[in-house]
């Protein structure tokens, strides 16, 4: 459950380390984003010589949330941190690698490139 001002880790090698959500996309006055949703983020911490720099405003896909994700079979999945993957305007990831597990709910939201780059799909 990601809202405005939420800090997230970046789960790719785009050069960003931490980002802050500044807008949840999809509908007017939408307050919360969950796994697979697209948000607008500001880069708060980045490494030198990365593809992005501090202060950049980008779009990102939420890939992990500390809030439970309920599945149709009744099971629940949750992660230790909130994490996102930076994307471009064509919804393709900026980085070439994804770090950490991602849930299979991303498949239903058509983020197949992120699924294919991820080391583990839960």
Swiss-Prot record:
One GO MF term attached to the UniProt entry: large ribosomal subunit rRNA binding
SUPFAM superfamilies: Ribosomal protein L14
UniProt GO BP: translation
Assigned keywords, A-Z: Ribonucleoprotein, Ribosomal protein, RNA-binding, rRNA-binding
One term under GO cellular component: cytosolic large ribosomal subunit
Keyword Ribonucleoprotein: yes
Superkingdom of the organism of origin: Bacteria
SMART domains tied to this protein: Ribosomal_L14
Pfam families according to UniProt: Ribosomal_L14
Matching InterPro entries: Ribosomal_uL14, Ribosomal_uL14_bac-type, Ribosomal_uL14_CS, Ribosomal_uL14_sf
Listed CDD domains: Ribosomal_uL14 (cd00337)
Gene3D superfamilies, sorted: Ribosomal protein L14 (2.40.150.20)
Coiled-coil intervals: none
Annotated family: Belongs to the universal ribosomal protein uL14 family.
Assembly and interaction partners: Part of the 50S ribosomal subunit. Forms a cluster with proteins L3 and L19. In the 70S ribosome, L14 and L19 interact and together make contacts with the 16S rRNA in bridges B5 and B8.
Role description: Binds to 23S rRNA. Forms part of two intersubunit bridges in the 70S ribosome.
Cross-referenced NCBIfam families: rplN_bact
Protein name: Large ribosomal subunit protein uL14
Organism: Agrobacterium fabrum (strain C58 / ATCC 33970) (Agrobacterium tumefaciens (strain C58))
């Amino acid at each position: 459950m990601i809202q405005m001002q939420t800090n997230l880790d970046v789960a790719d090698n785009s050069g960003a380390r931490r980002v802050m959500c500044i807008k949840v996309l999809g509908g007017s006055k939408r307050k919360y984003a969950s796994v697979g949703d697209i948000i607008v983020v500001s880069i708060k911490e980045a490494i030198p010589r990365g593809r992005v720099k501090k202060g950049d405003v980008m779009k990102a896909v939420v890939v992990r949330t500390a809030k439970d994700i309920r599945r149709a079979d009744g099971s629940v999945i949750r992660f230790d941190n909130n994490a996102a993957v930076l994307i471009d305007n064509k919804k393709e990831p900026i980085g070439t690698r994804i770090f950490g597990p991602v849930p299979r709910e991303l498949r239903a939201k058509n983020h197949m490139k992120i699924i294919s780059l991820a080391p583990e799909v839960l």
